[in-house]
UniProtKB/Swiss-Prot annotation:
Residues 95-106, 199-211, 243-257 have a biased composition (Acidic residues). Residues 737-747 have a biased composition (Low complexity). This is ATP-dependent RNA helicase DRS1. Keywords: ATP-binding, Helicase, Hydrolase, Nucleotide-binding, Nucleus, Ribosome biogenesis, RNA-binding. A motif (DEAD box) lies at residues 438-441. It comes from the Eukaryota. Residues 60-72, 794-808 have a biased composition (Basic residues). GO terms for molecular function: ATP binding; ATP hydrolysis activity; RNA binding; RNA helicase activity. The gene is DRS1. ATP-binding RNA helicase involved in ribosome assembly. It comes from Phaeosphaeria nodorum (strain SN15 / ATCC MYA-4574 / FGSC 10173). Residues 44-59, 149-164, 755-793 have a biased composition (Basic and acidic residues).
Length: 808
């Protein structure tokens, strides 16, 4: 009779001893973990006894040794010692086998073993989160580097023993070697005296700030600075401000009344939500009071989140109920966690038999998508939820492999999401249950309109939709287009206000002094704000040029804009985050959502096109309760945006000051910049030549690959897109027009081929501009007509004679 088995566990094919020695289990486990993304692999895809198998062999050996008797134990003492060490490592697995009361699927250690508490979690600080960061650093070495070009040119000058260049280099080093406390000085008569970025001078700031605020509040134009010493005449308000103030207020009141009626019918009633809170009578002071699952609480503790922010306390309970949410809160208030936590909590109770993608989170920029991906994977490190990052600039082949594993959550930019939706067979969106639009007001603008419509018409209509932004739109018509069902509106300090810890400074550029803008910027960066500064530009070209100027002056800076490759963009953020560069020169690509730790100052080289963009720019500092400064160089065309910013700050009671730049410092930098103009042009020219050479090499390599692997390349299916190239260009132009229309600007129109009518109109206009010219009189015109008639008659007679001769 066969011996009775101790437990009722039924071995499958993978559990049999015949398969245990081939060594393939570990490879399969490693491969599945690699394909499954950053999270832990699923239970249904893993072999439940892969971790138990190495521990079964010693347990079976022990049973055989008992049957053999004491001789077997004495003969083999060394294997027994090895078995004890193995059992110590696999102690949890042994308990599962020995105790029938514990569930066999219970997991003692899930996720990364080295995961621990992280102080001041940074979305860019996750070493494993950023996709291929080290590989991207190697790829970036092929790109053109401004620092290398400048260093090479300086070495050439040193080799030529140019005494003038040597003296200039030494002067530059003397100017920028210190960055000490003595350098952070303002002019004695400066309007923002003592308004430095150092935290030690906060007491002086408050004393001077009271005077500054009183002065700037009297400036009815929303002044970007105090009048110069030369101006003695009292300030007179601008006529445009006086004319437009009353009409704007009247129009805004009418629009608010209409929108209020629409909102009352569209949004869920807020009273019912407040009534539920009163009945519950349980204040949410921590995440434990939200009844979150244990893995989610462990993930929050690992990041260092202990208490929810106001937007998190409001949004998480409602989002966990599956309701649509429209959330708005100030910058740096934790909106990302406000929608990630309820999503992860709901996914813990998903059906796990059939893997499918259930959540789609959309971001307007690639950097924001990478940051959200890192935060999500860190929060879900103690769960089996899987993630995929679909952003432009990364390898689409790697993303296709990741999508074959059917990740639970997809964090994407709209363009790459649509690309995979049309061209990747393994990517299915029919079972999406949750849709999230972060920075929703930007996603609803003209530039993303067609892409968003394409996504919304493809994914299921029966879904939960959540929108979040710091400047959340109140236009109901845009929200109706998304297909929301009685959404709950949650607004926490979202009245287009800045953060309380932010001090706003304005440097006014008088009319005719706009050419001194760069000199003002260089003085500020040299003397006042020397570390952890983000400088925003409107144009990519200007940001790159200033990057060259900074490099020539010895200031360590990185640039971030759309003309850079994705590898370069990530490297720029990493260099600034790690402290390798003190300045980040960026366009509005970095204005939304980017959360970099300890950014002390934000400088606007030019005021942005709208007040909403201004709020997002200055929101890169003073995040999560910290203090920070925002400095704006404002000229006459920036009057409207500056006026709105000062008015909102005055209503909010935040600190607004004006700063003056000493005239002698401005003149010194103007002379220095004039001397560097030729060097700047030479550097840009050399960079252009190197870039052209690298592009030629790339095209040559591509052509060689086309010849060598022609059959394989042609066998690949052609990638399709829902828009033509003309439609793409039209969409971009429409977005640029909408953006610049808000600032009262105009968009450059491309030259088109002139038709015949247009050419005649232009000729007529030229004739009119030339003035009076000689024209034929009536008699002359009559003579011409008579001659024409005579010629016509002669031609007819000739034709008749020819016809008669031909008949004969």
């Amino acid at each position: 009779m066969a011996p009775r088995i101790d437990d009722d566990f039924v071995f499958t094919i993978s559990d049999h001893d015949d398969v245990s020695d081939d060594g393939g289990a570990e490879e399969i486990a490693a491969a599945s973990a690699k394909l499954a993304g950053r999270g832990k692999k699923r239970k249904h895809t893993e072999d439940p006894d892969l971790n138990i198998r190495p521990k079964e062999a010693p347990s079976k050996k022990a049973k055989k040794d008992k049957k053999k008797g004491k001789k077997g134990k004495q003969a083999e003492p060394e294997p027994a010692a090895e078995d004890e060490s193995d059992l110590e490592i696999a102690h949890p697995g042994e308990d599962v086998e020995g105790n029938d009361d514990i569930d066999s699927e219970f997991e003692f250690a899930v996720g990364d073993i080295d995961t621990g508490f992280v102080e001041e979690f940074d979305g860019w600080g996750n070493a494993e989160g950023t996709v291929g960061r080290e590989q991207n650093a190697e790829k970036k070495s092929n790109a053109v580097d401004i620092d290398d070009i400048i260093e090479r040119r300086q070495n050439k000058k040193m080799a030529e023993k140019d005494t003038m260049s040597d003296s200039e280099d030494e002067a530059d080093k003397d100017d920028f070697s210190g960055f000490g406390e003595d350098d952070e000085l303002l002019a004695e008569d400066g309007f923002g005296m003592g308004a430095g970025s150092d935290s030690d001078s906060e007491g002086d700031d408050e004393e001077d700030g009271d005077q500054d605020e009183s002065k700037i509040n009297n400036d009815s134009e929303g002044g970007a600075g105090e009048s110069d010493d030369e101006d003695v005449a009292p300030h007179v308000p601008h006529p445009m401000d006086l004319e437009g103030a009353e009409s704007d207020d009247a129009m805004s009141e009418q629009e608010d009344a209409v929108e209020a009626k629409k909102a009352a019918a569209f949004f869920a009633p807020e009273e019912s939500e407040s009534g539920k809170k009163k009945k519950g009578a349980k204040s949410i002071g921590s995440f434990h009071a939200m009844s979150l699952s244990r893995p989610i609480q462990k993930g929050l503790a690992a990041i260092g989140f202990t208490e929810p922010t106001p937007i998190q306390a409001k949004a998480i309970p409602i989002a966990m109920q599956g309701k649509d949410v429209v959330g708005g809160a100030e910058t740096g208030s934790g909106k990302t966690a406000a929608f990630l936590i309820p999503i992860l909590e709901r996914l813990l109770y998903r059906p796990k038999k059939v893997p499918t993608t259930r959540v789609a989170i959309f971001m307007p920029t690639r950097e924001l998508a990478v940051q959200c991906f890192n935060v999500a994977t860190k929060l879900a490190s103690f769960t089996d939820i899987t993630f995929a990052l679909l952003a432009g600039g990364f390898s689409s082949r790697e993303q296709e492999v990741m999508l074959k594993t059917r990740p639970d959550v997809v964090i994407a930019t709209p363009g790459r999401f649509i690309d995979h939706m049309h061209n990747t067979a393994a990517f299915q969106v029919e079972h999406l249950e949750i849709l999230v639009l972060d920075e929703a007001d930007r996603m609803l603008e003209e530039g993303f309109e067609t892409q968003l419509n394409e996504i919304l018409t493809t994914i299921p209509k029966s879904r939960q939709t959540m929108l979040f932004s710091a400047t959340m739109t109140s236009t109901v018509d845009k929200l109706i287009r998304i297909g929301m069902d009685k959404p709950v509106r949650l607004m926490v300090d979202a009245k287009k206000h800045t953060v309380k810890g932010l001090t706003q400074e304005f440097i006014r550029l008088r009319q005719g002094k706009e050419d001194k803008r760069l000199a003002y910027l260089m003085y500020i960066c040299e003397k006042i704000y020397t570390e952890r500064v983000i400088i925003f530009f409107r144009q990519k070209k200007e940001a790159h040029r200033v990057r060259v100027v900074f490099a020539l002056c010895g200031l360590k800076a990185s640039e971030l804009h759309g003309n850079m490759s994705q590898e370069q963009r990530i490297q720029a953020v990493e260099a600034f985050r790690s402290g390798k560069s003190s300045y980040l020169l960026a366009t509005d690509v970095a204005s939304r959502g980017l959360d970099i730790k300890n950014v002390s100052t934000v400088i606007n080289y030019e005021a942005p096109q709208s007040h909403e963009i201004y709020l997002h720019r200055v929101g890169r500092t003073a995040r999560a309760g910290r203090s920070g400064r925002a400095c704006t160089l404002a000229a006459e065309p920036d009057r409207k945006v500056v006026k709105q910013a000062v008015k909102q700050s005055r209503d909010q009671g935040s600190k607004v000051v004006s700063r003056q730049v000493p005239v002698e410092e401005t003149d010194r930098w103007m002379e220095k910049l004039r001397g560097l103009e030729d060097e700047i042009e030479d550097v840009l020219k050399e960079e252009k030549e190197e870039r052209t050479l690298s592009i030629t090499e790339r095209d040559l390599k591509r052509g060689m690959n086309l010849i060598e692997h022609e059959a394989e390349i042609k066998s690949r299916p052609k990638r399709v897109w829902f828009e033509t190239e003309k439609e793409k260009m039209a969409e971009r132009e429409k977005g640029a027009a909408a953006l610049n229309a808000a600032a009262g600007g105009s968009v450059k129109q491309k030259k088109k081929k002139l038709s015949g009518k247009d050419k005649k109109k232009l000729d007529a206009r030229d004739e009119r501009s030339e003035g009076k010219i000689w024209k034929k009189a009536k008699e002359d015109r009559g003579m011409d007509t008579n001659r024409a008639k005579e010629k016509k008659a002669l031609a007819k007679n000739k034709s008749k004679k020819i016809s008669k001769l031909s008949r004969r």
